[in-house]
């Protein structure tokens, strides 16, 4: 599989200097403001968290485990997955669950240390491609029958950027393909200092996709809040 990024073809096995991870927020510390994804302070915060034994408690927190379990069920609802895209891998907790069900999986993110950690966790399986990119700039020469984008888009600076990111992803979604979206609700995201959250992005996605299934998750704390929605691309392949 070939992926095109910034005019360069990136193949399946990339040199270490190209490894990246996407911004994947968590329910435990999603209040960190990320006004510019590439600022030094934000990278320092992410790198410190990634150095922990269980970054963002994605493995140990019951709410996060439930969120990932429900994301996986939504991802598998359409049947076998030939070619999937995961936008944002954090430390690989969900990647590890999704990968065995995919013939091919592409993982994109913007923080190199996150992809490095996920690759080590996954023992570098041959059917996974790792790409350093953000969601607005990434592009693929192939279409995906599944795209998973969870706890990522509210890090963008404004709704126009969110629309741009959504439009970019939908150009890579195969006819009849599914997109699984997850995010905390608007109110929580705005309380954390972000522009908006789940309801706003869902409305944007609904303009172009068909909503198939929706799940609402709530944990013990106010920060443990998530809407998960599975969408289908209504465009026919014929």
Swiss-Prot record:
Coiled-coil positions are none
Q: Which UniProt keywords apply?
A: Methyltransferase, Nodulation, Plasmid, Transferase
Q: What is its EC number?
A: 2.1.1.-
One protein family per Pfam: NodS
For biological process, the GO terms are: methylation; oligosaccharide biosynthetic process
Cite any additional comment in the entry. Necessary for nodulation on Phaseolus vulgaris and on Leucaena leucocephala.
By sequence similarity, the record places it as follows: Belongs to the NodS family.
According to its UniProt entry, the function of this protein is described as: SAM-utilizing methyltransferase involved in nod factor synthesis.
Q: Under which name does UniProt file this protein? A: Nodulation protein S
The organism encoding this protein is Rhizobium tropici
Instruction: Name the gene that codes for it.
Output: nodS
